């Protein structure tokens, strides 16, 4: 058996889910190391040496350990052609601006909705969730409008780091109960919804769904 090119440190249905999907697209050999959160492994010296904040994911690569989901995805796309528009291609500029729009305006406020106490303490959690949930709804609507208008190949039913990144975030937001201000499903996204419905049927998505113990409808009926 060949030695894995990558080792992903992961936890079920966390941000490592996104990286796991991308790794499946690369076709490269990779190993998975499940983190024992209850035992405090995230705070262990060995893990903190890879990720100084003790968060998931982290990944060992041929160029050393990496952390931050968006950085890992970009690294994989640069090493494995086809996961994102190539440098110098006509689509590269549009891809980059919307990729970093997603990092800043979707992923960051999403994390604040799930962990509001990190922003301003437990006493302000309700206000933080309400504010950031409104921003999330607005920012997802802007992204959906762009997809309807431009139909970019890098955010389509063709698997890519961008489509999987957005899909997993919609997955998480769909897990909130009806009436929660941050709840968002594929039904709320006229352009993106059908794309994610197709995307979840690809082999990479189905393989990861099985490995994670999820229903095969990982984006459209996640929970």
Feature map (PLM): residue ranges:
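GST-like domain detector, emphasizing the conserved glutathione-binding G-site
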Residues: 1-130
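Phosphate-coordinating loops and pocket residues in cytosolic domains that bind phosphorylated ligands
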Residues: 49, 201, 210
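Structured helix-beta-strand junction loops
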Residues: 53, 79, 149-150, 202
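Active-site-flanking alpha-helical
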Residues: 77, 169-170, 209
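GST-like fold's C-terminal all-alpha helical module
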Residues: 102-198
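Acidic/histidine-enriched, glycine/proline-rich intrinsically disordered or flexible terminal extensions
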Residues: 212-223
């Amino acid at each position: 058996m060949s030695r894995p090119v990558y080792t992903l440190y992961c936890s079920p249905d966390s941000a490592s889910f996104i990286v796991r999907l991308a790794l499946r697209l690369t076709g490269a050999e990779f190993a998975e190391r499940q983190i024992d959160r209850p035992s405090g492994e995230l705070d262990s010296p060995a893990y903190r040496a890879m990720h100084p904040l003790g968060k998931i994911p982290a990944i060992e690569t041929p160029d050393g350990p990496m952390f931050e989901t968006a950085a890992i995805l970009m690294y994989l796309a640069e090493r494995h052609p086809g996961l994102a528009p190539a440098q110098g291609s006509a689509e590269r500029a549009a891809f980059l601006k919307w990729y970093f729009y997603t990092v800043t305006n979707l992923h960051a406020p999403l994390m604040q909705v799930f962990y509001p106490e990190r922003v301003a303490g437990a006493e302000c959690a309700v206000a933080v969730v309400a504010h950031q949930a409104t921003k999330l709804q607005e920012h997802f609507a802007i992204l959906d409008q762009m997809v309807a208008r431009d139909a970019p190949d890098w955010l389509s039913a063709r698997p890519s780091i961008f489509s999987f990144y957005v899909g997993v975030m919609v997955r998480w937001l769909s897990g909130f109960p009806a009436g929660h201000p941050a709840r968002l499903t594929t039904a709320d996204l006229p352009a993106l919804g059908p794309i994610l419905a197709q995307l979840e049927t690809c082999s990479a998505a189905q393989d990861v769904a099985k490995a994670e113990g999820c229903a095969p409808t990982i984006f459209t009926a996640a929970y």
